[in-house]
Amino acid sequence: MTVEDNLDIDFSDLEEKYAVNADEGFESFIVVDGAPVIPQAKQAALANVMKKFFGAVGKIKEDGIFIPFDEATGKSTGFVFIEYETGEMAAAAVKSFHNKQFDKNHKLLVNKLSEVEKYGMQYDTLKTEEFVEPETEPFVEQGHLRSWLMDPQGRDQFVLHRGDTVGVFWNKKGDTLEADVDRERWTETQVYWSPTGTYLVSTHTQGVQLWGGPDWAPPICKFQHPNVKMVQFSPCEKFLVTWSNVPLVLPDDEEKRKSIPFGPADEGKQIIVWNLETRLPVRTFAMPPEKKGASMSWPILKFSPDDKYAARMIPGEQLSIYETETMSLLDKKSVKAPGIVDFEWAPALVNLEGRQKSATESVLCYWTPEIGNQTARVVLMKASNKEVLRTRNLFNVADCKIHWQDQGRFLCVKVDRHTKSKKSTFTNLEFFRLCERGVPVEVMELKDTVTNMAWEPHGDRFVTISNSDSTTNYDGPLPANRHTLSFYALERHKGTQGTWKLIKAFDKKNCNSLFWSPNGRFLITVMIEGSNSIDLDFWDMDYEGDRKHGDKDLPANLHFLGSSEHYGISALEWDPSGRFVATWSSYWRHHTENGYKIWDFRGQLQREESIDRFKHFSWRPRPPTLLSKQQKKDIRNNLEEYSRKFEEIDAMEASEASRELIMLRKRLLEEWTAWRAQTDKKLEELGLVEPEPAESEYTTIEEIKEVVVEDKEEVCE
């Protein structure tokens, strides 16, 4: 038998039988790529730094660090070989330090020594195979993802989910809807807007799709997550989080595994974090252990306002903070918080007193209940270095709710406390002032139990709903007209010494929900769920008429604008401008009188539509304005001019006849203006235009006229 004949024989069964374990003898070695390139004189210094860095996960053998050098250049090659005491330590090093930032300019790639040989063999195999150029997908232009902001009339959009149909429509006056897009079976369950309105998300059995642009087609991108149920965006739209109630299962077929972006470490996980730029998963998480009878809290992963950090808690145990750039645990360890119940990020970066004015921080707050002899605690923490800014110890605590002011300047923790007999409860409001030195705390003690509290956007005023029936053994909904609605304002004229004072409290109000306008000032109170109430109450905190309620020194003039009705209301949402508000009755809640209504901020009905199997309404969010403070001021000063333009547009939309007449007048005026400009130019060229006289050539003529205003005759005797 010749050598050529031997080449045709299949030895795969023998190779498999006598295969050598590549890890045997090398299991405790790792190879580090991306280390700093140094001259030979700095070898000892780099070895010491590497030993300290990699020694965090296990003991490195004596002389267990080898740094190879290039003889031609006399410098290191950027590789480092490290030997640990055990293979488990080496495996931990790969898991902890792969793709880890070593310093500002160096990111490390860490692999086992045996894996390097395996990848080299795969490369040699690929070299012998014929190269097949991968198919390049044709570029499809999506159009500008914020094209709706260029609408000449500055209108907002909203999405309607009716039966199996989903459509995006313009908010306009009139009876007919103007659709931007309207499609059958666009989603299998729900649709979601991203925080700034860039994307509309549709959910499907195989995953989610993101839509946008002027044409709404094709989908911008797809994310594969079977049986996805919940979707969440980070505030800056850098990350997308999906959750499925079914753990992730990898296919058995090797070819199918290559088509999905998941590996063995992701199997069994239910939460996936996606990078919207790369469209790849950055990390997967398992669900935290569930307590019996406890419902799932969403979102599970919460992001800082700048998308720099993300945090999640293991209920009752710890709080884990991650750096989103690598999705690695900050400082490689979690914050131990025995009994932790809830946490919330400040909605904006906070400028802490005593720090540089330009330096802003991501701050979060969490609370733990009373456990044994340990008091309940509210903790304020700076995320970057886990510095505790303020701790507040509390006693006899039944529950806490965290309420951040939207600019992060104030934090209110609503503390429900029980009496010593534990038969009734009352509420304390604990106010933290983050922009003052030491984060002082102000306590407002109330006799009633506060059921809801809401800060005014961009302001320091707030509103509470409370009730005097504070028995702890009553779980049902309160009877109608048992709530007290209270308005509070801060004494601004006293500066940092000012406290929050009551403006006015209204008893026997039938409401459980508070909805502030996005721009503040206007408020709607309503009863949602658990009641047949149909009333919406509209309030103005800065009424321009006479003051009726509250201290004259408080920065508020409260006025009740009126009530409106919507039977079976299940949700309410303001539009981004704060001029309109939508209420709707969802088929998902009940099956009677489904539909939606749109009101203006004063409670005047603008549009009403009853729709069978109506499911959801949602305004399209807008990104933060790019206008400067001066530009905003100029717009406010010229509101009358803008109002005339919009009134003209409204008149044109009122009827086709009015539209044609206004357009004709506008065209004739433009033609006359153009003719007049052309004529003046010709006269000027011919020298027939008399120059305007200088100011000194003007003659001032004064005329004195006597006018008889009244003629009276008096008879003197």
UniProtKB/Swiss-Prot annotation:
<dbReference type="GO" id="GO:0005852">
    <property type="term" value="C:eukaryotic translation initiation factor 3 complex"/>
</dbReference>
<keyword id="KW-0396">Initiation factor</keyword>
<protein>
    <recommendedName>
        <fullName>Eukaryotic translation initiation factor 3 subunit B</fullName>
    </recommendedName>
</protein>
<keyword id="KW-0963">Cytoplasm</keyword>
<dbReference type="Pfam" id="PF08662">
    <property type="entry name" value="eIF2A"/>
</dbReference>
<comment type="subunit">
    <text>Component of the eukaryotic translation initiation factor 3 (eIF-3) complex.</text>
</comment>
<dbReference type="InterPro" id="IPR035979">
    <property type="entry name" value="RBD_domain_sf"/>
</dbReference>
<dbReference type="InterPro" id="IPR013979">
    <property type="entry name" value="TIF_beta_prop-like"/>
</dbReference>
<dbReference type="GO" id="GO:0010494">
    <property type="term" value="C:cytoplasmic stress granule"/>
</dbReference>
<keyword id="KW-0648">Protein biosynthesis</keyword>
<dbReference type="GO" id="GO:0006413">
    <property type="term" value="P:translational initiation"/>
</dbReference>
<dbReference type="GO" id="GO:0001732">
    <property type="term" value="P:formation of cytoplasmic translation initiation complex"/>
</dbReference>
<feature type="domain" description="RRM">
    <location>
        <begin position="28"/>
        <end position="115"/>
    </location>
</feature>
<keyword id="KW-0175">Coiled coil</keyword>
<feature type="repeat" description="WD 1">
    <location>
        <begin position="183"/>
        <end position="221"/>
    </location>
</feature>
<keyword id="KW-0677">Repeat</keyword>
<dbReference type="InterPro" id="IPR000504">
    <property type="entry name" value="RRM_dom"/>
</dbReference>
<dbReference type="GO" id="GO:0033290">
    <property type="term" value="C:eukaryotic 48S preinitiation complex"/>
</dbReference>
<dbReference type="GO" id="GO:0003723">
    <property type="term" value="F:RNA binding"/>
</dbReference>
<dbReference type="InterPro" id="IPR011400">
    <property type="entry name" value="EIF3B"/>
</dbReference>
<keyword id="KW-0694">RNA-binding</keyword>
<dbReference type="GO" id="GO:0042802">
    <property type="term" value="F:identical protein binding"/>
</dbReference>
<feature type="repeat" description="WD 3">
    <location>
        <begin position="293"/>
        <end position="332"/>
    </location>
</feature>
<dbReference type="GO" id="GO:0071541">
    <property type="term" value="C:eukaryotic translation initiation factor 3 complex, eIF3m"/>
</dbReference>
<feature type="repeat" description="WD 6">
    <location>
        <begin position="564"/>
        <end position="609"/>
    </location>
</feature>
<feature type="repeat" description="WD 2">
    <location>
        <begin position="223"/>
        <end position="284"/>
    </location>
</feature>
<dbReference type="GO" id="GO:0071540">
    <property type="term" value="C:eukaryotic translation initiation factor 3 complex, eIF3e"/>
</dbReference>
<comment type="similarity">
    <text>Belongs to the eIF-3 subunit B family.</text>
</comment>
<dbReference type="Pfam" id="PF00076">
    <property type="entry name" value="RRM_1"/>
</dbReference>
<dbReference type="InterPro" id="IPR012677">
    <property type="entry name" value="Nucleotide-bd_a/b_plait_sf"/>
</dbReference>
<feature type="region of interest" description="Sufficient for interaction with PIC8">
    <location>
        <begin position="1"/>
        <end position="216"/>
    </location>
</feature>
<feature type="repeat" description="WD 5">
    <location>
        <begin position="506"/>
        <end position="549"/>
    </location>
</feature>
<comment type="function">
    <text>RNA-binding component of the eukaryotic translation initiation factor 3 (eIF-3) complex, which is involved in protein synthesis of a specialized repertoire of mRNAs and, together with other initiation factors, stimulates binding of mRNA and methionyl-tRNAi to the 40S ribosome. The eIF-3 complex specifically targets and initiates translation of a subset of mRNAs involved in cell proliferation.</text>
</comment>
<dbReference type="GO" id="GO:0043614">
    <property type="term" value="C:multi-eIF complex"/>
</dbReference>
<dbReference type="GO" id="GO:0016282">
    <property type="term" value="C:eukaryotic 43S preinitiation complex"/>
</dbReference>
<dbReference type="InterPro" id="IPR015943">
    <property type="entry name" value="WD40/YVTN_repeat-like_dom_sf"/>
</dbReference>
<dbReference type="GO" id="GO:0031369">
    <property type="term" value="F:translation initiation factor binding"/>
</dbReference>
<dbReference type="InterPro" id="IPR034363">
    <property type="entry name" value="eIF3B_RRM"/>
</dbReference>
<keyword id="KW-0853">WD repeat</keyword>
<feature type="region of interest" description="Sufficient for interaction with HCR1 and TIF32">
    <location>
        <begin position="1"/>
        <end position="89"/>
    </location>
</feature>
<feature type="repeat" description="WD 4">
    <location>
        <begin position="445"/>
        <end position="484"/>
    </location>
</feature>
<dbReference type="GO" id="GO:0003743">
    <property type="term" value="F:translation initiation factor activity"/>
</dbReference>
